[in-house]
UniProtKB/Swiss-Prot annotation:
Record's protein name: 1-deoxy-D-xylulose-5-phosphate synthase
EC number in record: 2.2.1.7
Top-level taxon: Bacteria
Phylogenetic placement of the source organism: Bacteria, Pseudomonadati, Pseudomonadota, Gammaproteobacteria, Alteromonadales
Binding site for thiamine diphosphate: H80, G121, H122, S123, G153, A154, N181, Y288, E370
CDD domains listed in its UniProt record: TPP_DXS, TPP_PYR_DXS_TK_like
Keywords: Isoprene biosynthesis, Magnesium, Metal-binding, Thiamine biosynthesis, Thiamine pyrophosphate, Transferase
Family the UniProt entry places it in: Belongs to the transketolase family. DXPS subfamily.
Details of cofactor binding: Binds 1 Mg(2+) ion per subunit. Binds 1 thiamine pyrophosphate per subunit.
An annotated GO cellular component: cytosol
NCBIfam families documented for this protein: dxs, PRK05444.2-2
Any Pfam family the entry gives: Transket_pyr
Catalyzed reactions: D-glyceraldehyde 3-phosphate + pyruvate + H(+) = 1-deoxy-D-xylulose 5-phosphate + CO2
UniProt-listed HAMAP family: DXP_synth (MF_00315)
């Protein structure tokens, strides 16, 4: 259900940036207030990312007011903070559908709107893309401006500094807005720095600055003295040395919730030459007290009533696989102080909060730097420690070279706890864990495990901890576990051995992972054998051979891309054994999986019990 726009009289006049730019600047504070209220109520209806968007309302209004979007390019990093952008760019009436099946995409998405100039979802990509667009703009000579908006969290990623180093060297015209919400806005930032930013971005100062550079060009000693004097003046209130050293002109920090100051500063900066950084200070969750006090807890929210000032209470249910991992990690750390846990800024999502509090000296948050996190773990393994890398499937993609070159090649005993394997649902194609089995299976020295339930997950984690001949991975899905009883005692599983769960006739279903329950349900109608394969690599070749010899048809089931996945491994072994056999591979198709609830996506892909049965019957009928 969409909101009644008549409750937002000024925002109603700004359904697009063109309409926004027709309004007098004096109305912009009211636009921002109504936009924040609209966002608050809209996310309450739809669920979704919340605190980040509340913090970028004034910034979004100012950007679309000053810049001629979509002609001017605006790139959002990650995109959690882009809900206000969607509201102001013609998608206001569809905001209640965001992250839902057939609804608005959770992140800026090129296919959705001309205002979304670059599709995003992973961190640290905006400046690289913006630099390319700035280079293209210079070649076109059409007067196009380019702006990248990036948060302070994303600034921890190495790709960001690679891009800034390149941009500073090329010196193309572009603006990087650094949205810094790590600290509250002090009076100093809100007043003095707003004035200083407008002064330093103004025409008189920049003309003087550029003219001085030309005059002093042939006098390097004097030029260096002048540069140091300027840095001393700015350094009294401005922490911009790093950006200046990278070749950027730095302005700020300024109050990111003062829309008039943002507009005036951006107007001044719009025509500056070379790469620019505008540093703004914002508050995550701005305007909604619970989110201001707990921005992490309110980062993403279910449907809720904003008037209650709390998230809806949920009945205690099954633990999530992330919680199963977190408990195992604490249990094993109690036994072994050499266990070290590493995560790339995913403490909460990976279930590591308790561990980080109880074992702070054994916990390492590498920030949004997946490559560094994996090689850090390799170094720990070299020194005899037991590193455990907790990482989402989609983010492990970013450290693929490190996984191969720094871990597997050296046969280092690093345990990868891979969360969000398979369908994640509402976050869509940028976050589905569709490829990990495929891209890990081809790496020598890897052991890859796919648990069917929480108890098997716990035992597999212990198996990986005990395995010292090389790296191992335990891959589990997002969401609640299956309800299986967890055995507290930990036992290492025999490497590369599966378990027969049901004995049937004619058809054998070889299951990899948590679709086992659905496979068993489908098997009842087919009187099929069901095998919990457990290990994707090394594959239980003896069991595959036995199933091929005693059944007419083999069916592989996995929540991973069919291409190169676990089922492909079964086919490779049958080929190697010279055993021609009818094999149906069930898994994720050769496409990027769209957003929707996990249940909806699973049903649409025919990966629930009903769908598995239908796929097998259709195959048998051919």
């Amino acid at each position: 259900m969409s909101l009644d726009i008549s409750q937002f009289p000024v925002l109603a006049q700004a359904n697009t940036p063109n309409e926004l730019r027709q309004l007098p600047q004096a109305l912009l504070p009211q636009v921002a207030d109504e936009l924040r209220e609209f966002l608050l109520k809209s996310v309450g209806i739809s669920s979704g990312h919340f605190a980040s968007g509340l913090g970028t309302v004034e910034l979004t209004v100012a950007l679309h007011y000053v810049y001629n979007t979509p002609f001017d390019r605006l790139i959002w990093d990650v995109g959690h903070q882009a809900y206000p952008h969607k509201i102001l760019t013609g998608r206001r009436d569809k905001m209640h559908t965001i992250r839902q099946k057939d609804g608005l995409h959770p992140f800026p998405w090129r296919e959705e709107s001309e205002y979304d100039t670059f599709s995003v979802g992973h961190s640290g990509t905006s400046i690289s893309a913006a630099l390319a667009m700035a280079i293209a703009a210079e070649k076109e000579q059409a007067g196009r401006k380019v702006v990248a908006v990036i948060g302070d969290g994303a600034m921890t990623g190495g790709m960001v500094f690679e891009a800034m180093n390149h941009a500073g060297d090329l010196h193309n015209d572009m603006l990087v807005v650094l949205n810094d919400n790590e600290m509250s806005i002090s009076e100093n930032v809100g007043a003095l720095n707003n004035h200083l930013a407008q002064l330093m971005s103004g025409r008189f100062y920049t003309t003087l600055r550029e003219g001085g550079k030309k005059v002093l060009k042939g006098m390097p000693v004097i030029k260096e003295m002048a540069k140091r004097t300027e840095e001393h003046l700015k350094g009294m209130v401005v922490p911009g040395t790093l950006f200046e050293e990278l070749g950027f002109n730095y302005i700020g920090p300024i109050d990111g919730h003062d829309v008039d100051a943002l507009v005036e500063t951006m107007r001044n900066m719009r025509n500056l030459k070379g790469p620019q950084v505008l540093h703004i200070m914002t508050k995550k969750g701005r305007g909604y007290e619970p989110a201001e006090k707990d921005p992490i807890g309110w980062h993403a929210v279910p449907k809720f009533d904003p008037s209650l000032f709390k998230k809806p209470t949920t009945k205690p249910g099954l633990p999530t696989f992330s919680q199963v991992f977190g408990k195992w990690l604490c249990d094993i750390a109690e036994q072994d102080e050499k266990v070290l846990a590493i995560t790339p800024a995913m403490r909460e999502g990976s279930g590591m909060v308790e561990f980080s509090q109880r074992f702070p000296k054994q916990y390492f948050d590498a920030a949004i730097a997946e490559q560094h996190a994996v090689t850090l773990s390799a170094g720990f393994a070299c020194e005899g420690f037991k590193p455990v890398v907790a990482i989402y499937s989609t983010f492990l993609q970013r450290a693929y070279d490190q996984l191969i070159h720094d871990v597997a090649l050296q046969k280092l005993p690093v345990l990868f706890a891979i969360d969000r394997g398979g369908i994640v649902g509402a976050d869509g194609p940028t976050h589905q864990g569709a490829f990990d089995l495929s891209f890990m299976r081809c790496i020598p020295n890897m052991v890859i495990m796919a648990p069917s339930d929480e108890n098997e997950c716990r035992q597999m984690l212990y198996t990986g901890y005990c395995y010292d001949a090389g790296p191992s991975a335990v891959r589990y899905p997002r969401g609640c576990a299956t309800g299986a009883t967890q055995v507290e005692a930990m036992t290492a599983l025999p490497i590369g051995k599966g378990v027969i769960k049901r004995v049937g006739k004619r058809i054998a279903i070889l299951n990899f992972g948590t679709l086992l329950a659905s496979a068993l349900t489908a098997a009842e109608s087919l009187d099929a054998t069901v095998v919990d394969m457990r290990f994707v690599k090394p594959l239980d070749v003896d069991l595959v051979k036995e199933m091929a010899q005693t059944h007419e048809v083999l069916v592989t089931v996995e929540e991973n891309a069919i291409m190169g996945g676990a089922g492909a491994g079964v086919l490779e072994q049958l080929q190697k054994l010279r055993m021609p056999k009818a094999v149906l591979q069930i898994g994720l198709p050769d496409e990027f999986i769209k957003h929707g609830s996990p249940e909806e996506v699973t049903h649409d892909l025919q990966l629930d019990a009903e769908g598995i049965l239908a796929q097998i019957n259709a195959y048998l009928a051919q």
